[in-house]
Design a protein with these regions (language model features):
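Short amphipathic, positively biased membrane-proximal segments
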Residues: 1-221
Length: 221
């Protein structure tokens, strides 16, 4: 199982503690040390699952050129009209995906093109499923442009998530579904597409990052 590199510092402490206690238990024949190693081993296993980075179809085959893909695994919270006061200036549709603590937290670009803008906003740590988290929580906003097509997407942290990792900067070229970063421990992602796109998902639907088409351009490139 592939682990995102941001996860290794978190895995090192419980993994090292588990190993040290196991060795101590064997060398000194202390049963308590062997038993104490198990919770650390369980925590290591959970963190490994949390920071997992599975391959997706877009990693081996380019998606359809008109498709906008989900940037993350999770459940669709918003599909269609933007929440009040949330969308960037302009005429947009919104798709928001809520990530639970058991979902893959690696984030992917929903569409191809050049990163034209990147901004980070510090903020609160409200529950990510609450509407006001979109404009009050800590977040990172990225704009990607391909010709006359523009898609805006945001990484938004929640109650448990306390750090956003964004690995692209303005000027970078990204492919649809390409890895662009991750959010740690529960969060949401908002995607904004123009009115000319058709939203393909519905509220409550489960989606997979880099695989599920959440919107489609109405005209081919």
């Amino acid at each position: 199982m592939r682990i995102d590199r941001a996860g290794w510092p978190f895995l090192a402490v419980p993994l090292g503690s588990s190993a040290a206690l196991s060795v101590l238990g064997r060398v000194s024949d202390r049963r308590w040390a062997r038993l104490a190693a198990w919770p650390f081993l369980a925590l290591t296993a959970y963190l490994a699952v949390f920071f997992r980075d599975p391959q997706r179809r877009c990693d081996s085959a380019p998606p359809a050129s008109e498709d906008v893909l989900s940037p993350a695994d999770g459940v669709v919270m918003v599909a269609g009209e933007p929440q009040p006061g949330v969308a960037p200036e302009g005429d947009w549709q919104q798709v928001s995906v809520f990530l639970s603590v058991v979902d893959v937290h690696v984030n992917r670009s929903p569409y191809r093109g050049r990163i034209t803008s990147s901004s980070y906003t510090p903020g609160s740590f409200l529950a990510a499923y609450r509407a006001e988290s979109a404009h009050r929580n800590e977040r990172s906003e990225l704009w990607v442009q391909d010709g006359d097509r523009t898609v805006v997407f945001r990484q938004i942290v929640g109650v448990l998530a306390r750090r956003i990792v964004t690995r692209v900067v303005p000027g970078d070229q990204v492919a649809t579904g390409e890895r662009i970063g991750l959010m740690k421990f529960g969060s949401r992602m908002d995607v904004f597409v123009p009115r000319e796109c058709t939203v393909l998902v519905t509220k409550g639907q489960r989606v997979r990052g880099g695989e599920t088409a959440i919107a489609r351009w109405s005209r081919p490139t």
